[in-house]
């Protein structure tokens, strides 16, 4: 009759982040170009993920859970900031195209 740890390796509630969930979030952040736009935040997420793995191996589940939650938040923030930056770049490109078209129209009118 051993006691089960409070940490879960699978999601059991909204607040419980599994190792797999946190790793997926870090992968998603990389897919959102976080390596380019938010490398420090992405590295923090990946480091916390690695530290959490070590804590799980040492059965320090509450500490691992906190690190997994932090890693997930860092990864989500890195992804969101990267997506925002990509959107800003797309808007800037569209604005340049509009400006070029306006300049052409003005030249054609002259």
How would you name each of these model-derived features?
Residues 5-110:
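Long, charged/polar, soluble alpha-helical segments
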Residues 1-2:
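Sec-dependent N-terminal signal peptides
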């Amino acid at each position: 009759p051993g006691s089960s740890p409070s940490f879960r390796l699978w999601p059991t509630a909204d607040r419980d982040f599994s190792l797999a969930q946190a790793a997926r979030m870090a992968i998603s952040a990389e897919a959102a170009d976080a390596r380019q736009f938010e490398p420090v935040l992405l590295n923090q997420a990946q480091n916390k993920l690695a530290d959490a793995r070590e804590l799980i191996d040492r059965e320090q589940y509450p500490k691992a859970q906190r690190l997994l939650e932090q890693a997930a938040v860092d990864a989500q923030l890195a992804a969101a900031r990267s997506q925002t930056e990509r959107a800003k770049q797309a808007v800037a490109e569209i604005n340049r195209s509009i400006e070029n078209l306006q300049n052409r129209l003005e030249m054609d009118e002259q």
